[in-house]
Amino acid sequence: MSKIVIKERRHMMTISYNKLWKLMIDKNINKTKLREEAGVSSNAMAKLGKNESVQLEVLAKICKTLDCNIEDVCEILFEE
């Protein structure tokens, strides 16, 4: 699985959407239903599945649909 890698001085950061997939299981919603209800593209969902960069607007739509905050769907992982 590819990751978003951001180099910042001596630290590496990756963005993970694993929280999103867990939340979807908890709320009993699949990717197709989320995509349709949130109004996001198939391309955006595919990028999320590969931990690739997506626009903040996509995450905002998903959060609104799932009635959650952004920290409930993604996290930044710091590596040294």
PLM region descriptions:
Residues 2-31:
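A short, Lys/Arg-rich alpha-helix, primarily the initiator
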Residues 24, 35, 63:
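The alpha-helix within a helix-turn-helix
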Residues 33, 44, 72:
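Residues in the helix-turn-helix
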Residues 39-54:
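Recognition helix of helix-turn-helix/homeodomain-like DNA-binding domains
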Residues 51-64:
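Short, basic-rich loop-to-helix N-cap that marks the start of a DNA-contacting helix
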Residues 67-80:
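Short C-terminal boundary/hinge segments that cap the last helix of small helical domains
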